[in-house]
Curated annotation (Swiss-Prot):
Transmembrane segments: none annotated. It comes from Vibrio vulnificus (strain YJ016). It holds the Pfam family UPF0149. InterPro entries: YgfB-like, YgfB-like_sf. Gene3D superfamilies: YgfB uncharacterised protein family UPF0149, PF03695 (1.20.120.740). This is UPF0149 protein VV2847. Disulfide bonds: none annotated. Belongs to the UPF0149 family. One of its GO terms (cellular component) is cytosol.
Amino acid sequence: MSKNQLPSYQVVADEMKMATLAVTPAELHGLLAGMISGGLSQQDQSWQPMLFDYTNDGMGWPSAALEQAQALFNVTSAQLTSDEMVLNLLLPNAEGEEAIFALADALSDWVNHYISGLGLAGAALNKASEEAKEALADLEEMARLGVDEDDDLQEQAELLEQVIEHVKACALLIHAEFGAKTSSSETPTIH
């Protein structure tokens, strides 16, 4: 796995299942992305106790699952702080008619846990800019979206892809406002 490439959804799902952790890959990734976007330090392990509290009643994770979470944290941090403005979401990519329902559910889980991660990190959302407040409101609305099995599934799949892109844009905007700034970008102004 490269520095900016997420692990496969199924690999993370299998690891969480083996560790008997009741968290999906989408929930885990959304939570980590939210904590990072909320201003959590990326230079230490302060995210781990929050993760343990939120997902496992404060109990530590088995080492293999924690390594998977650490890799996911590192990739997500690299993507959010990159100048490329690219964020990939850890969502299932199954085929077939049922895949759209699984994707919609996973996206809802990702968004809900992203918002929770913002709260865990202590983001001062009440002091957010109008753009960030609008992005957060959009995320809250998108978390409630679903797929209607009576409608054209192909059309809904296309709309879902547009929603996913909007989720990414909202997350990047929120991170730009609340995310911890790297010290290398803080160059003093010389007069």
